[in-house]
A protein has these predicted regions:
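Short amphipathic alpha-helix that is part of the acyltransferase structural core
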Residues: 1-12, 38-44, 88, 96-137, ...
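Acyl-donor-binding surface of acyltransferase catalytic domains
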Residues: 45-107, 232-234
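Conserved acetyl-CoA-binding loop-helix of GNAT-fold acetyltransferases
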Residues: 50-57, 176, 182-195, 220
């Protein structure tokens, strides 16, 4: 198994229970956040049959869930009409020289104030996912993960969270205030985390959308793509082709 997959699974087990559902499907369930797609996905080990997908759909309907998500490490030959998104796992090799990463000396890194963190995330995620979900999600994550905040002039201008296991450190949820873009906020956060990881002999990694620009920036910083997750989501069951 690719080592980061083991760390990712341990991450999900912080929030979700896992149970075998069918020959090719394992179900994740987070009863604290029933409406969070990633925490309640079906993980496939091979191509699900139409009968398996029908059973998965019936299960979701019985739970009152209005979505169906499948994810796995190989593309599906039959996606049943669902759109696919690809997420890269990018690892920073431990020998990477990070001294050239540009940072902002006026930025301080510390644990963010809980209220400031909620307001910071509401500003961006509220319009996308709704205020109620954004607050519930942040509080759920904050209970079990380590958040880091970037402060400039006493203001929280960036944040992310980290999860460490088995010699690997995953950095995710990076969010920078758009009013402070191009001031090396993200780079300062990332360098802080990378330095700590290297000091402890741990390997830093992150996830990046295969279609978005940040993956190219990460590559220039020295991150290398080592894995790819295929994610299939349906929020309108009438569009499923089964």
């Amino acid at each position: 198994m690719i080592p980061t997959r083991k760390t990712d699974e341990k991450f999900y087990r912080l929030f979700s229970t896992f149970h075998a559902f069918s020959e090719h499907l394992t179900k994740r369930e987070d009863n604290e956040l029933r409406d969070k797609y990633d925490h309640n996905a079906f993980c496939y080990s091979g191509q699900p049959t139409e009968d398996e997908l029908r059973a998965a759909l019936a299960y979701q309907k019985e739970r009152g869930d209005t979505f169906l998500k499948l994810e796995g490490y190989e593309p599906l030959a039959n996606a049943f009409g669902m759109e696919c998104e690809e997420t890269l796992t990018m690892v920073l090799p431990p020998e990477t020289d990070i001294r050239s990463w540009k940072t902002n000396p006026d930025v301080s890194i510390k644990a963010p104030d809980a209220d400031q963190l909620e307001q910071h995330e509401l500003k961006y995620y509220g319009p996308l996912y709704g205020d109620d979900f954004t607050v519930r999600n942040n509080r759920n994550l904050r209970e079990k993960l380590t958040y880091l905040g970037a402060y400039l002039g006493g203001k929280l201008v960036g944040d992310c969270y980290i999860f460490a296991s088995d010699g690997y450190v995953c950095m995710d949820g990076l969010l920078v205030d758009e009013d402070f873009r191009h001031q090396y906020i993200a780079m300062t956060l990332m360098k802080h985390i990378a330095e700590k990881a290297q000091e402890r002999g741990e390997i830093l990694y992150l996830h990046a959308d295969s279609e978005d620009t940040p993956k190219e920036l990460y590559a220039k910083m020295g991150f290398q793509a080592v894995d790819k997750l295929y994610e299939y989501l349906c929020t309108d069951f009438s569009k499923l082709k089964i």
